[in-house]
């Protein structure tokens, strides 16, 4: 047995919605991957930075993309920002990256996709969220009930 990072296999993390990990949380998926490695191989098996790297650069590598996965000139500008000034992060800011992974934020403060701001101050800027949620829940009910 060996830790995933030592296996030589390209590893990427991702979610495609609430049906895939019961929460649609990419950071939750990063945390889960880290914890599973630590359970199997000890507390030093993976750091928060390594787990986040699987979700960013690792995801790009798995997709054979060299234009995503990092913030650098010439790369697609996709990133999120979290406000660490909340009670959930109290006492954890000596390592903000680990705080982000272990404290599992419940919402994104800012999200930029392909250079376009889609979440600002925690609110979607691109859609009418109540309308989308109503439609989503209607479709979900129909799917479950067989309507």
Model-derived features: where do they sit?
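Residue-level recognition of short, well-ordered coil/turn positions
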Residues: 8-9, 116, 147
